[in-house]
């Protein structure tokens, strides 16, 4: 039975997901339904957490909009997610960057990762 479930989940995995790490800045385009219309909405932020669970994988993006911190969790393989683009690679030494929630301004900056 579990082989059938694994096979179905394998078929639903997206193949065009770029590799990214915590600290990277991503732009995620998501389909948003407003009434009877569908449109793409872009969300650009820093990856503060990644949860790798196969089909149930997710990542958390954080950005500051009008002085207010906004965090959004995206399911990596969701059909609502249209595209994921890596804008900038960040150099960090932790897997979870929850400490950025308490920081603002220059102390919340992340160095750029150079090279590979």
Curated annotation (Swiss-Prot):
Keyword Secreted: no
Listed InterPro entries: Ribosomal_bL19, Ribosomal_bL19_CS, Ribosomal_bL19_sf, Translation_prot_SH3-like_sf
GO cellular component: cytosolic large ribosomal subunit
Keywords assigned by UniProt, alphabetized: Ribonucleoprotein, Ribosomal protein
Source taxon at top rank: Bacteria
GO biological process, one term: translation
Presence of keyword Kinase: no
A Pfam family: Ribosomal_L19
Any one GO MF annotation of this record: structural constituent of ribosome
Function summary: This protein is located at the 30S-50S ribosomal subunit interface and may play a role in the structure and function of the aminoacyl-tRNA binding site.
NCBIfam families (UniProt xref): rplS_bact
Family under the similarity heading: Belongs to the bacterial ribosomal protein bL19 family.
PANTHER family per UniProt: LARGE RIBOSOMAL SUBUNIT PROTEIN BL19M, RIBOSOMAL PROTEIN L19
Entry protein name: Large ribosomal subunit protein bL19
Organism: Haemophilus influenzae (strain ATCC 51907 / DSM 11121 / KW20 / Rd)
Gene: rplS
